[in-house]
């Protein structure tokens, strides 16, 4: 029999890290043409024999990559001998996120960030908006004089929310929101960039934030409440103007992405085709990774310590900043049909991330499945500009169709099930 063409059987061991789904650890002979459909049927039959459990949907990993076709084709692509016993790992399938809300705005939504019960959005009409994660509009905030480009929360409790916004007006603004009275004030205007400010990220301790700009500069600022222009003129202090604590030069084009990797390390991505890792204690570049496309967004995972990029093509790419081979791409993810504008790792699920693109689509991915996303998250009628998964319960995105789309993730779906 020609096993390599799918005829005949392959010896496999079925493994799982989810012990309640474990089956006997013995070799099984299965047909080489099996797909996830037949493997699901087989594993569920074994589980019913073991304890009478009801059917569960599983995904299957063969040599650390999701099986997306026939087993024989997967093994051939990996150059694995068909005569060896093959280990197949199975995991409970992550449920499809469900659409919850469509939040209507007056202009393009270019920035979104969720925290607790709230969603903060920024628009091309120069305004910020606050919403509940159930879709109720709370407040419209004016202050910037050009389109908003990025937002981030500094701190949030039952009484007070603090956040930062950046704009094409060359400033960042610090805001304080009194939750009880639903009133907001601009605490400080942060001046120092000479072009629009494209990206922002607040430090893990909430004491600093970093901005990236079209002027190619990376700047670090104080986010503390009593710090307006420390060391600056009395006039600047009284007006609430802040100046940067640190300015770092190294990129040659717009700094389109910035994120704190830890308390003293920053990641940036740029239109100059590079990722840079900055050591703030030395105020210099620690690592540089060259890519072959302009970077629109980048995301670092504290769970797996890997970096994802969204670029000026249809692909997402995975990099390991710890490797000495800085330009080597760990994986490329194919699925979007236009430029990918935005990407973000899950903060709680080690292998999962979301992306949004100019093909009007969001996608949910597992980094072990490069050939296809887990799910398409449909709803936007125009280009997606920003996506956020800061709140593990909700995937939130904004776009050119003047909407924020809210999708329930597994944690919210589980709560709904428990409530019924």
Swiss-Prot record:
GO molecular function: ribonucleoprotein complex binding
Pfam annotation, one family: WD40
InterPro entries referenced in this protein's UniProt entry, alphabetically: G-protein_beta_WD-40_rep, NLE, WD40/YVTN_repeat-like_dom_sf, WD40_repeat_CS, WD40_repeat_dom_sf, WD40_rpt, WDR12/Ytm1
Keywords noted in UniProt: Nucleus, Repeat, Ribosome biogenesis, rRNA processing, WD repeat
Gene Ontology annotations for the cellular component aspect, listed alphabetically: nucleoplasm; PeBoW complex; preribosome, large subunit precursor
Entry keyword annotation includes rRNA processing: yes
Family as reported in the entry's similarity comment: Belongs to the WD repeat WDR12/YTM1 family.
Designated name of the protein: Ribosome biogenesis protein WDR12 homolog
Organism: Drosophila erecta
Organism taxonomic ancestry: Eukaryota, Metazoa, Ecdysozoa, Arthropoda, Hexapoda
